[in-house]
Amino acid sequence: MIESEHRPTQIRVNLDAIAENFEQVMTNLPPKTEAFAVVKANAYGHGAVAVAKKLSSQAAGFCVSNLDEALELRKAGIEHPILILGVVPVRFLPVAHQLNISVTVASLDWLQDAKDLEADLSGLTVHLKLDTGMGRIGFRKIADLLQAIAILEELEYDIEGVYTHFATADEVEQAHFESQLSVFKEFLDVLPITPRWIHASNSATSIWHADTVFNLVRLGNILYGLNPSGRVLELPFGVQPALSLVSEIVHVKQVEAGTTIGYGATYHSTDSEWIATVPIGYADGLVRSLQGLSVLVDGQACEIVGRISMDQITIRLPRAYPLGQKVTLIGQDGDKTISVQEWADRIGTINYEVVCLLTDRLPRIFE
């Protein structure tokens, strides 16, 4: 998708806020705890390269989802450790090895395929993933883990880390969390090795279970000023939202009562109204179910009326405004704010998904 840099619609990212959020979390963790910043999915829509460069003096390393995301960081000059959290097909391991990118080992089947590779990958750095109750990837039996370690030593891979992922660290009920923590400790008790990093804490665990961290945490959406729990658990400290989404009015008109607006002619003006058009739509991540949400114009809430189109929305204004008038879809204008969480509430999802839905067509402006 081509970035629309000649359009007034853009995402603005406050990199200083991200750096300050990082420090805010770290001050609440035990001394000597290290952190990998999670910059997968283009840093949750905020811009992976820019975020990684900003955090290069704070983070011990970075987590990504796949090899291509890791390559993007390496090509941008990021030399920190990079851990791929997903499973990398073994045929691509030589690329990871060449660029010193750490991969996740999650099954004996994968290891057998790695053994069959006709390539010397000695020194490849790996992290062993344990499935303690998340149910996605990872070793579930101690015997399988021990066998995996033996194979890794035979292949002369460097076992840099062992980790798991909690499924319910952001919820009120903690029985499943405690069960996962107990299972993880049982695995650790029989480890015949001492990896550099042992990690289980995502953002939620680092925030609400700081006493259970090991020597490394993985900080994700909290860095971007988002609450991992949505509205379920309150944050024990303040963070700054790092992303705002703005555009401009490109067309404005006064319509008489009974005028229809948008596809399906679903909106009918009830009186003489000022209607403005803003160049953003569902192709940018403004999904159609956000119809009826308000945006901010001159510090005033203005409702999105009519169906959201692929590239445009229409909003109802309190009065006439000139072309070029700023429109805030996420962020602050005057004393009013529209948050990512408000979008999530409107469409029945989580704040993570909202920022990840914002497409690459939207230019990221770093401030």
UniProtKB/Swiss-Prot annotation:
Active site: K40, Y263
Alphabetical keyword list: Isomerase, Pyridoxal phosphate
Positions of modified residues (N6-(pyridoxal phosphate)lysine): K40
EC number: 5.1.1.1
Biological process per Gene Ontology, one example term: peptidoglycan biosynthetic process
Enzyme class: isomerase
Cofactor or coenzyme needed: pyridoxal 5'-phosphate
Gene3D superfamilies: Alanine racemase (3.20.20.10), Lyase, Ornithine Decarboxylase, Chain A, domain 1 (2.40.37.10)
Residues involved in substrate binding: R136, M310
Annotated GO CC locations: cytosol
A single GO molecular function term of this UniProt record: alanine racemase activity
Catalytic activity as recorded in UniProt: L-alanine = D-alanine
Record pathway: Amino-acid biosynthesis; D-alanine biosynthesis; D-alanine from L-alanine: step 1/1
Role this protein plays: Catalyzes the interconversion of L-alanine and D-alanine. May also act on other amino acids.
Similarity field: Belongs to the alanine racemase family.
Protein name (record): Alanine racemase
